[in-house]
A protein has these predicted regions:
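Conserved helicase motor
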Residues: 23-26, 42-60, 76-78
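Flexible, charged surface loops at secondary-structure boundaries
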Residues: 8-16, 36-37, 61-70, 85-89
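The feature captures the C-terminal accessory region of ATP-dependent helicases
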Residues: 154-240
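SF2 helicase motor core recognition
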Residues: 28, 65, 71-93, 115-126
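Conserved strand-helix element at the start of the C-terminal RecA-like helicase core
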Residues: 2-36
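A conserved SF2-helicase RecA2
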Residues: 126, 133-134, 139-168
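Short loop/turn segments at strand-loop or loop-helix junctions that form parts
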Residues: 22-25, 44-48, 93-100, 136-140
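Conserved SF2 helicase motif VI
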Residues: 100-129
């Protein structure tokens, strides 16, 4: 992974503008330092991330888009959607996923990858909005559950939940209510319940999506197939 990333930055050394999407402030900071990009880069991330970077000695980090951009511009996930990036030059886009350091750097080809390229709306003379889009990732078994496995898991949780919540609602003893609440929180996964201990259907939908995306990163072939299945990208797949 690290060697491939270095090779890609070398390939893009003559690009006027490179926009790198990596959902890890720590990963971005390590990359900037290892490639000696401090004087040519800007980082766009959360306020908390800006604070961490300043503590680490990197001052060119902000929490909202402002211009001009640098040669190398790093964005965390809050900039994957909703924010337009306006440029006078056609950028090269680089998406990075490093599962060895942060599982949350995965990118969903069906949503986030499409949203990322959609941040660049200016169409140039060749009818394109960017020069290239490259996604570099390592792969591993993240223990993704199939939809059928997750169905069964959630069904079992719901049976347990229903039993406990009925006992909770029937009892008038405050100590019993407290005990049953604690049992609910211990037995059920976080995504299953909202703050009021009701079934969180939005959380359940997110869990299905999370497991779906994790399954793509079991191999390069599976991720390639997912990109192809979107019918949005013309994909060239290379394994190194």
């Amino acid at each position: 992974y690290e060697r491939t990333v270095r090779e890609e930055f070398q390939r893009l050394k003559d690009s006027s503008c490179v926009c790198i999407f990596l959902n890890s402030v720590t990963g971005i900071n390590e990359l900037v330092n290892s490639l000696h990009l401090e004087g040519e880069s800007r980082i766009f991330c959360s306020e908390e991330g800006v604070g961490k970077l300043k503590d680490a000695g990197f001052t060119n980090a902000v929490s909202s888009i402002d211009y001009p951009l640098a040669k190398y511009n790093f964005f965390t996930s809050r900039f994957y959607s909703a924010v337009d990036i306006e440029l006078n030059v056609k950028p090269d886009i680089l998406i990075l996923t490093n599962l060895n350091n942060a599982v949350y750097t995965t990118v969903d080809p069906y949503t986030e990858a499409i949203q990322i390229q959609g941040r660049f709306r200016r169409m140039f003379e060749d009818k394109q909005t960017f020069n290239s889009l490259t996604h570099i990732t390592n792969t591993c078994d993240l223990g993704a559950l199939s939809r059928e496995e997750l169905d069964k898991q959630i069904d079992e949780y719901k049976i347990t939940y229903q039993s406990l919540i009925e006992r909770h609602n029937k009892t008038t003893n405050s100590a019993r209510k407290t005990s049953l609440k604690q049992q609910l929180k211990q037995i059920c996964e976080d995504y299953l319940l909202d703050e009021r201990l009701n079934i969180d259907y939005f959380g359940i939908d997110n869990k299905y999506n999370e497991e779906r995306v994790k399954s793509y990163y079991q191999s390069g072939e599976k991720l390639y197939a997912a990109y192809e299945a979107t019918k949005f990208f013309r994909v060239n797949y290379e394994e190194r």
